[in-house]
Amino acid sequence: MLTYDTWEEPAITFPEDDSYKGALSVLKWAYGHYGDQLVYACSFGIEGIVLIDLISKVKKDAEIVFLDTGLHFKETYETIEKVKERYPGLNIILKKPSLTLEEQAEAHGDKLWEREPNQCCYIRKILPLREALAGHPAWLSGLRRDQGPSRANTNFLNKDDKFQSIKVCPLIHWTWKDIWRYTSKHELDYNILHDQGYPSIGCEPCTSPAFTAEDLRSGRWNGMAKTECGLHE
């Protein structure tokens, strides 16, 4: 089994010229290789909706983890409920941080995300995902290369030093237009905030409409020297 400890640049190739740009081939390999040990950490943005639909073609009872920070838009929770209705076999887990927002405010001060967003992300996202991935050799992510400069070199299979795991990214060759074409063709429900100028959706206090079409994550952490929550750095 390919794991963090046995990692070598994989001699595995996936076709990129099919209608899925390699995504379905990657998923079939990943679930065939890891089975129930493979976890999808999903934010339920538009890429996540597409990837869930593809996953459902391969493993109808896949485990999907949502990092429930307690700060998400209500529209995000509404999207999760729609996904549950469409794919009743999926095992969707809402993973909460060990600290409630009240406990975090007591320990670190109110609205930590405004003063120390990196620490807030660490408490409410990184630590919970680390717990969720414990004992799992690999996880899925919906990263795409054209989401921004920090993701341009993502591969199908990646050695993930942060979580000491293998990060599998089936959608790396999909463009923003590919995502929306697939969504429309298959009539997938998605977060309505995408129709209101939010191409990338995270926690409500740290998410604004995008400022530029060239960087779909330009609406995240507005005014701060920060473009990632830390999960993919």
Swiss-Prot record:
Its cofactor is [4Fe-4S] cluster. It comes from Bacillus velezensis (strain DSM 23117 / BGSC 10A6 / LMG 26770 / FZB42) (Bacillus amyloliquefaciens subsp. plantarum). SUPFAM superfamilies: Adenine nucleotide alpha hydrolases-like. This is Adenosine 5'-phosphosulfate reductase. The lineage of its organism: Bacteria, Bacillati, Bacillota, Bacilli, Bacillales. It is an enzyme of class 1 (oxidoreductase). The keyword Signal does not apply. Pathway: Sulfur metabolism; hydrogen sulfide biosynthesis; sulfite from sulfate. It is found in: Cytoplasm. It comes from the Bacteria. GO terms for cellular component: cytoplasm. The keyword Membrane does not apply. Belongs to the PAPS reductase family. CysH subfamily.
